[in-house]
Amino acid sequence: MLTPKRRGLADTVGFAHRREQIEAVVERISAQDGARLSDIRKAKGIAADDRWRLAIAPHDDYAYAGFMYPLALRQIAAPTLVIFGVAHRARDLELEDRLIFDSFTHWTGPYGDIAVSSLREDIVARLPEASFCISDEMHAIEHSVEAKLPFLQHFNRAIEIVPILVPYMSYARMRELAQPLARAIALTMRERNLGWGDDIAMIASTDAVHYGDEGWGGRNFALYGADRAGYAKALAHEHRILRDCFEGELAPDRIERFTRYTVADHDHREYKWTWCGRYSVPLGLLTAWHLQQLMDAPRLSGTVLGYTTSIEDQRIDVSDLHGMGVTAPATLRHWVGYAAVAFR
């Protein structure tokens, strides 16, 4: 038997990495926000047996993002998950314009190893060579996929994953990459007789706006000002993005609209509005849209499940959980938004 090639952990402070940690976090979210989660699901018309084919979910500290994780991920029932992650440090490794896969056999989970699905090799084998690269280094230092795994494994011990990081690229390049990726996934699904939503699902990772004029490496992300009035205006801007891009039927023009909201017109490497998933989200959505066509599947319809920020709600207390805590401040001068979106 081959020796497993395990990916380690990038963040043991913001996220759970032990069984007792994730179980305590889930219990505390249920105690603090369980009624709220139930009310949201009822208001959004979500039945207990509804299954997401695609979800957008955050990757920030559990203390801050808290209930957004189960809100976005609880209805993911498929055991095989294609996860589109952010490549936060792609510039450091000079990576852009290609999908980034890994070669690990397993990722570390709180209940034991999480296998990388053999679908990865089938998918990669069907992609144009210039469309992807393999970088274990990039995957090892990136936290956006890792953040979701403790919750996903808590809900389903049998999960397998296909992690794909999405670095800098223009919307035109996203369109070039999404179609062959969707085709590769569709062919693999047909070969293995996999149902979308039941056997395989997709997750796109992003935190929403990174806002404020303090603690952002000398940059000022406070477009509307770093006070209560600015906070209210920033929230209105966020809800406009969610409404314009994700609520209702998924369509390419709405996906492109998201990039126009978030990516600078003069340089796709720069922010217009600071969602770190400005590449992972549209690439994931475009792939899903093409997959819908190729599989002759029902049209994907988005539901904005919820939105909050690192300063909006009561934190989940993790201070007693074996070194867990927060990795950044949360003030009017430095805060992050979180969105949960489901596509059925």
Residue spans for each PLM region:
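Long, Lys/Arg- and hydrophobic-enriched amphipathic alpha-helices
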Residues: 185, 290-292, 297-344
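Active-site histidine-anchored catalytic micro-motif
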Residues: 1-286, 290, 294-295, 307-315
